[in-house]
């Protein structure tokens, strides 16, 4: 069960790195996720009855405010355009331009960053 939890957490963290939003999770978020992994095995020790009381949540000085205060750092996320991978590249507007770098062909657009493409 512990290996399943570790795989799930690592898959979620790698998925965050590939997402189209550029953001870094709050340090408390990562600590709570990892502390949940370390708390779970103690509850599953053989020969010990599982307690009905939930483990106390980790407290951090910056998290003591309201729920709005805890999620305040999410409001400042700035989306960044990802790169589409295509076999044939096309200019999507008059401001798109081709660039050859590292042996690949790219399309960039300063007017519409969502037009970025990479030849794959």
From Swiss-Prot:
InterPro entries reported for this sequence: Mitoribosomal_bL36m, Ribosomal_bL36, Ribosomal_bL36_sp
Highest taxon in the source lineage: Eukaryota
GO CC term (a single one): mitochondrial large ribosomal subunit
One of the GO biological process terms: translation
Compartments reported by the entry: Mitochondrion
Alphabetized GO MF terms: structural constituent of ribosome
Keyword annotations of the record: Mitochondrion, Ribonucleoprotein, Ribosomal protein, Transit peptide
Pfam family, one: Ribosomal_L36
Quaternary structure annotation from Swiss-Prot or TrEMBL: Component of the mitochondrial ribosome large subunit (39S) which comprises a 16S rRNA and about 50 distinct proteins.
Record family assignment: Belongs to the bacterial ribosomal protein bL36 family.
UniProt protein name: Large ribosomal subunit protein bL36m
Species, as recorded: Osmerus mordax (Rainbow smelt)
């Amino acid at each position: 069960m512990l290996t399943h939890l570790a795989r799930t957490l690592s898959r979620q963290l790698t998925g965050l790195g590939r997402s189209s939003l550029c953001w870094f999770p709050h340090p408390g978020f990562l600590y709570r996720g990892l502390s949940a992994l370390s708390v779970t095995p103690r509850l599953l020790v053989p020969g010990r009855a599982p307690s009905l009381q939930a483990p106390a949540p980790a407290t951090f000085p910056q998290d003591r405010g309201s729920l709005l205060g805890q999620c305040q750092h999410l409001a400042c996320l700035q989306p960044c355009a990802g790169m589409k991978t295509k076999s044939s590249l096309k200019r999507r507007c008059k401001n798109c331009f081709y660039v050859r770098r590292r042996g690949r062909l790219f399309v960039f657009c300063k007017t519409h960053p969502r037009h970025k493409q990479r030849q794959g």
